[in-house]
């Protein structure tokens, strides 16, 4: 067991040494735990697609400091700092990408997904390299031991496998939150989900759990469309079959189209109500809810070409516009992707901004409160109503972490999992 008196323990971790470095497996020496820090022996950690660029390509957004790769994971607590109260040695925990302090402005407004202290405080080094450089770990799971703040740790009391649970640390957590928290899906709703990676497929399941009458999944890769149908989608669409898109000239009306878009037209047709009579509940144009989890294929100025296939626009910008246009006049649109370049503009007609009644929510982290929702999601797995096993496609040892990210980038499987102590 690691304790503060045993600080100095040598472990292995996948480190990114600088912004142009490809991460590699390195020995590091742990520092003593302080404050609310928790040491967790890592059993499984999923590869978040948003980290692909930082891991495999030179990245202007990667930290300048030496850092451990990863976005959370699952493991067993082996030591706690002197101020830790929410977990204890021996607990099995999900280490979330973001924490929730419970005290900041966002948390007090029940927006724990936007916690202002989501890292548990200012970054501090948790280990040192063999040549004495400080190592920062955040919520990084690609190490034999994670050192994280207690705010990121959610104790779970279950026999569900660590590989399945690891999907709840980041991507699955976000997708479920998109459909079950940020997006007010009601029984009988029509829901369109863009993207069938681990986030989108989790959103499909979340919409099903909320009672959606029709779920349409939009995905360019064939095997992912097939999996979406198995996990709850009622229909699937290949966006590469509907690529015609031309601007509409002139005033488009409060809820009018600003593009003539073949994909939007197709999805509207699939969501068409049985009647257009507005005095008997008809007249809706488009689905009740649109969830975007498509992402893009551009990182740091590099356009990647996933070997499994790609959509019509590798920058991910077109789909952001389609999400808004497709949404019905009083519907809800939720998006968790960032187009490329990050400062690119998504244009919305001014009259729709003021007079339209569409609702839009940014969906990063899915609106999830980890301590509240994590145990709920675990219970849904236990009862067979939520399938994370189907998303956790392939496991890798810690030494093959970079390859796990490469496979994730190529999208040949839904999600890859690293088992540092497996």
Question: For each predicted feature, which ranges?
Answer:
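Rossmann-fold NAD(P)-binding glycine/threonine-rich loop
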Residues: 317-326, 338-357, 374-376
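Short N-terminal strand-loop motif that marks the start
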Residues: 1-74, 140, 144-148, 421-422
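Glycine-rich beta-strand-centered segment in the early N-terminal region that forms part
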Residues: 29-47, 58-108, 113, 155-160
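NAD(P)H dinucleotide-binding glycine-rich loop of Rossmann-like/cofactor-binding domains
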Residues: 101-194
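N-terminal Rossmann-fold NAD(P) dinucleotide-binding loop
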Residues: 200-201
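C-terminal hydrophobic helical "lid"/dimerization subdomain
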Residues: 1-9, 252, 277-278, 311, ...
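Adenosine-nucleotide cofactor-binding segment
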Residues: 193-196, 208-322
């Amino acid at each position: 067991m690691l304790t503060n008196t045993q600080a100095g323990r040598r472990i292995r971790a996948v480190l990114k040494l600088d912004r142009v470095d490809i991460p590699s497996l390195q020995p590091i020496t742990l520092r003593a735990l302080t404050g609310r820090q928790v040491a967790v022996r890592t059993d499984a950690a999923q590869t978040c697609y948003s980290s692909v660029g930082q891991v495999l390509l030179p990245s202007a957004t990667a930290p300048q400091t030496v850092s451990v790769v990863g976005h959370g994971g699952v493991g067993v607590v082996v030591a706690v700092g002197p101020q830790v109260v929410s977990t204890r040695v021996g607990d099995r925990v999900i280490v979330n990408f973001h924490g929730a302090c419970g005290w900041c402005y966002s948390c007090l407004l029940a927006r724990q997904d936007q916690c202002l202290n989501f890292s548990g405080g200012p970054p501090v080094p948790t280990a040192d390299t063999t040549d004495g450089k400080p190592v920062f770990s955040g919520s990084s799971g690609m190490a034999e031991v994670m050192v994280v703040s207690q705010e990121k740790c959610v104790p779970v009391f279950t026999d569900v496998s660590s590989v399945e649970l690891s999907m709840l640390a980041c991507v699955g957590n976000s997708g479920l939150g998109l459909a079950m928290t940020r997006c007010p899906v009601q029984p009988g709703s029509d829901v369109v989900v863009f993207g069938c990676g681990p986030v989108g497929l989790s959103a499909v399941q979340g919409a099903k759990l909320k009672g959606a009458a029709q779920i349409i999944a939009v995905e360019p890769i064939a095997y992912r469309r097939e999996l979406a149908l198995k996990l709850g989608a009622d229909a699937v669409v290949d966006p590469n079959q509907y690529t015609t898109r031309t601007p509409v000239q002139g005033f488009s009306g409060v809820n009018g189209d600003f593009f003539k878009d073949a994909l939007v037209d197709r999805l509207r047709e699939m969501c068409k109500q049985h009647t257009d009579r507005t005095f008997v509940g008809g007249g809706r144009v488009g689905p009740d809810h649109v969830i975007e989890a498509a992402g893009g294929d551009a990182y740091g100025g590099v356009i990647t070409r996933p070997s499994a296939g790609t959509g019509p626009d590798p920058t991910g910008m077109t789909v952001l516009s389609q999400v808004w246009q497709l949404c019905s006049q009083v519907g809800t649109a939720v998006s968790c992707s960032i187009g490329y370049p990050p400062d690119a503009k998504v244009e919305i007609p001014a009259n729709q901004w003021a007079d339209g009644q569409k609702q839009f929510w940014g969906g990063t982290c899915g609106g999830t409160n980890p301590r509240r929702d994590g145990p709920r999601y675990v219970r849904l797995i236990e009862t067979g109503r939520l399938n994370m096993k189907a998303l956790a496609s392939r496991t890798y040892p810690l030494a093959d972490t970079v390859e796990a990210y490469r496979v994730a980038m190529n999208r040949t499987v839904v999600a890859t999992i690293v088992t540092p102590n497996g």
